[in-house]
Amino acid sequence: NYIFRNLLKIFDVIIQDNKNIPSYQMQCRGCAAKVDFNSLKTTLSKEIITTSEDAININNYPKLYQSVDMISSIVSDPYLLGKIAANHAISDIIAVNSKLISALMILQLPYSNSKINSRDLEQVISGASEVFKLAGCSISGGHTMVGKDKDPVIGFSVIGEKKSVNKKNLNQISLELKEVS
């Protein structure tokens, strides 16, 4: 699967770029920063949270799955950050054997002047759009804000449509799942 091979290359670049920094630790505050499932399950009603799956089925629409993912900056390049965040969000949809059909961006940039914010916004969108285009989708909107974090925080709310499994595509789906695992 092209998207996952691309994501692995991106992470290899991150590791290579940071391997000479003795105190380097990945601190993306993405998946590693999630509130644990038991806390969520205890606090939220069973109607809100029923599973720990990466993407959930949308009620009354058996073929539609939705997910949301966010990460803070693990690289200084906004373009590359956009690509990483898009791949991160898409992987949840692929994990439930679905094709991406919609993406909304959630982005917080650090307080800065308009010129820097415009430049960073353009770069994040450009990187993410490149990845979403490969997945057959585009960013259709979202929400932006500025905040006190010194680094950008980016996320996507994504929707996918479940792929049907038949004799013709069973081998292809099996190969895609092997590449993911």
Give residue spans per PLM region.
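Glycine-rich anion-binding loops of enzyme active sites
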Residues: 64-66, 70-72, 99-181
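C-terminal catalytic lobe of FAD-dependent flavoproteins
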Residues: 1
